[in-house]
């Protein structure tokens, strides 16, 4: 059986990237909560 995580930079950005987060209201909420928490990295 192959492993479930098959790294792919492009897909990672397309699904979890900053621009993807900014493109929806809930995505912006995610960024806001991560900023509020003080995360060093706010998106992939």
From Swiss-Prot:
Entry GO MF terms: structural constituent of ribosome
Chain segments annotated as coiled-coil in the UniProt record: none
GO biological process annotation, one example: translation
Transmembrane segments: none
A Gene Ontology cellular-component term: ribosome
Keyword vocabulary terms for this entry: Ribonucleoprotein, Ribosomal protein
Region of interest called Disordered, as start-end residue ranges on this chain: 1-44
Leader peptide range in chain numbering: none
Ribosomal protein as UniProt keyword: yes
Alphabetized InterPro entries for the sequence: Ribosomal_bL34, Ribosomal_bL34_CS
Entry similarity comment: Belongs to the bacterial ribosomal protein bL34 family.
Protein name per the record: Large ribosomal subunit protein bL34
């Amino acid at each position: 059986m192959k492993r479930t995580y098959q790294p792919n930079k492009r897909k990672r950005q397309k699904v979890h990237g900053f621009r993807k987060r900014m493109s929806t209201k809930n995505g912006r909420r995610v960024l806001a909560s991560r900023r509020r928490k003080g995360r060093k990295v706010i998106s992939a």
